[in-house]
Amino acid sequence: MAKLSKRARLIREKVDVTKEYDINEAVSLLKEFATANFRESVDVAVNLGIDARKSDQNVRGATVLPNGTGREVRVAVFTQGENAEKAKAAGADIVGMEDLAAQVKAGEMNFDVVIASPDAMRVVGQLGQILGPRGLMPNPKVGTVTPDVAGAVKNAKSGQIRYRNDKNGIIHTTIGKADFEPAQLQENLESLLEALKKAKPANAKGQYLKKVSLSTTMGAGVVVNQATLTQA
């Protein structure tokens, strides 16, 4: 607990909660706070100018970060025939159909992402109550139901993140690790913000990217001045 209280004191001393920080200063602070004995993630919260109660204003999608997430991702693919061979060649960890479904039903889910070809949805559809609550159900909106399973596997392995606003209109996701170079974190953040802009609902009014905050796994949030970003 001493380490945590020491970190908490440091954060209170260093972070002005009323201030928007230059991106470089924000990243420097995050790195200073990342003193946990594990490799901390850098997380982002983006407050969107949307009415999350309206389905036509919800924002959901996926994008590949230029510098990846720093996390090794295990990918399971539901497909068959030639697509199965392509998925394996692209680096899929587990490939199957009914046999893979049986593993899932038995609670054997040693994977982080599930991809399915359209013809496999008859099998995957039966697993909704298991995969859905875990955020693993394939969905065409985020590119995990696709005829191009090999491309989807490569995206997942190369640092694709999925995003979806919560009930308060906030996007929560990860943009890398605390030991990334500052320029890598900035590039990843700008790439995410660009993807969010492209996904802006037609009916959203006023300022769209209202607030951008960065934090490490065990750290406090630091608000970023968007004017210091290339994609602002």
Swiss-Prot record:
Gene3D superfamilies assigned: 3.30.190.20, 3.40.50.790
Recorded GO CC terms: cytosolic large ribosomal subunit
A Pfam family annotated for this UniProt entry: Ribosomal_L1
Keyword annotations of the record: Repressor, Ribonucleoprotein, Ribosomal protein, RNA-binding, rRNA-binding, Translation regulation, tRNA-binding
InterPro entries (alphabetical): Ribosom_uL1_bac-type, Ribosomal_uL1, Ribosomal_uL1-like, Ribosomal_uL1/biogenesis, Ribosomal_uL1_3-a/b-sand, Ribosomal_uL1_CS
Key word Chaperone present: no
Family designation: Belongs to the universal ribosomal protein uL1 family.
Function of the molecule: Binds directly to 23S rRNA. The L1 stalk is quite mobile in the ribosome, and is involved in E site tRNA release.
NCBIfam families (alphabetical): rplA_bact
HAMAP family in the record: Ribosomal_uL1_B
Assembly description: Part of the 50S ribosomal subunit.
Protein name: Large ribosomal subunit protein uL1
